[in-house]
């Protein structure tokens, strides 16, 4: 079997215009080894043992129940993105595993055709079983190498409205294929789980995969996200595409970014550096790096090259928030979204209560109190979704310490 032999007809407004030769059915897993779980409104067949493994097993399909929150965010992000779209809606998932994300998209979002791909035949068989369990007719399966699958959707009029890639490790080797398969005005969603690389344990590997290097700080997760975004934006620019972040989210196991893709040259200059002073704690995102801290004159540490633009698009976040009542979604999503709306216009590089308290050798203030003090003194301030004790502000670090110590 040569895997995907699919194409979309030039006029693909009707469901019967989609043609795909799917891999044969080969499910050999005993039904006693399976469990049916429900995410949102979707039933998903999962091998019992797969839910216990920390890495994808080779002999059975992998499922990560801890990623449910990520899939919840995806559903409301995709729903918000597609809400006013009039052209045909096509969702592509290059590394679908058991198909949890694609199954939910096909079952919970209306008027969309879902194409999922994986190299694991057992995963695909379970994916097909789950599709039948949910009565899905808009769910199509491919067994192929990722870029071969995406190449079938890389021509004009044939691209995905939403393209998703969720690998175990770094997504870097798939990004060009994903970008080529994303339509003009489409959405690219990308996950990364190689946190040790992104957090500075393997800088050579980080430079190869993400075109930059991190530094270890209290806001290392923001640096990691900006490295991922910088890599995607740089690859897109080389293809004469403009990639713009509109939403990012994270937990302790992964980073996930969402970017709008336009088929036009990128004329922006938003790849730069984050500079951090170990002596005074000043930090900033800049296009041109400097050796010395502008506040205290000490040597600075530099992370990058990376994305120095905004992480969020406020209008899109508001639209996501409006979609929440339509779906069965974890309540944490609303809490996170409200924080992202508050921080969407704030500067890069958040602070944490503990780092300020440690620098002053005092007890931390409450997050609400420091934000109130900053605002009362004429500064902008907000919590951040990236850290429960983090806050963003345009206040200089020396003034933050002064207000903290009052």
Predicted regions and their residues:
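SAM-dependent transferase fold signal centered on methyltransferase-like domains
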Residues: 1-406
């Amino acid at each position: 079997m040569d895997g995907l032999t699919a194409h979309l007809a030039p006029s693909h407004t009707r469901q019967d215009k989609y043609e795909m030769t799917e891999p044969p059915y080969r499910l050999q897993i005993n039904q006693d080894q399976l469990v049916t779980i429900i995410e949102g409104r979707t039933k998903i067949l999962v091998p019992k043992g797969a839910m216990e493994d920390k890495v994808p097993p080779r002999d059975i399909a992998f499922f990560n129940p801890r990623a449910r929150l990520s899939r919840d965010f995806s559903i409301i992000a995709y729903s918000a993105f597609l809400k006013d779209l009039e052209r045909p809606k096509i969702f592509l998932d290059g590394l679908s595993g058991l198909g949890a994300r694609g199954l939910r998209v096909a079952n919970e979002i209306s008027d969309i055709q879902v194409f999922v791909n994986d190299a694991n035949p057992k995963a695909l068989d379970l994916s097909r079983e789950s599709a039948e369990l949910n009565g899905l007719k808009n769910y199509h399966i491919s067994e192929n190498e990722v870029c071969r699958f995406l190449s079938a959707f890389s021509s004009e009029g044939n691209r995905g409205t939403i393209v998703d890639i969720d690998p175990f490790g770094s997504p870097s080797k798939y990004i060009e294929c994903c970008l080529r398969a994303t339509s003009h005005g489409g959405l690219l969603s990308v996950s990364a789980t190689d946190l040790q690389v992104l957090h500075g344990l393997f800088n050579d590997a980080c430079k190869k995969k993400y075109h930059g290097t991190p530094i270890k700080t209290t806001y290392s997760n923001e640096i990691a996200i900006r490295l991922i975004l910088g890599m995607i934006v740089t690859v897109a620019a080389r293809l004469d595409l403009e990639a713009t972040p509109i939403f990012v989210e994270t937990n302790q196991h992964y980073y996930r970014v969402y970017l709008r893709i336009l088929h036009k040259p990128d004329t922006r200059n938003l790849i730069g550096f984050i500079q951090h002073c170990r002596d005074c704690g000043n930090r900033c995102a800049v296009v041109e790096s400097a050796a010395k801290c502008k506040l205290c004159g000490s040597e600075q540490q530099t992370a990058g090259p990376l994305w120095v633009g905004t992480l969020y698009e406020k209008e899109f976040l508001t639209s996501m928030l409006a979609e929440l009542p339509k779906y069965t979604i974890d309540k944490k999503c609303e809490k996170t979204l409200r924080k992202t709306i508050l921080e969407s216009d704030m500067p890069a590089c958040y602070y944490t209560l503990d780092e300020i308290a440690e620098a002053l050798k005092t007890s931390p203030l409450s997050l609400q109190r420091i934000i109130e003090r900053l605002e009362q003194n004429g500064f902008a301030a907000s919590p951040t979704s990236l850290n429960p004790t983090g806050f963003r502000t345009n206040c200089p670090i020396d003034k933050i310490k002064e207000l903290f110590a009052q």
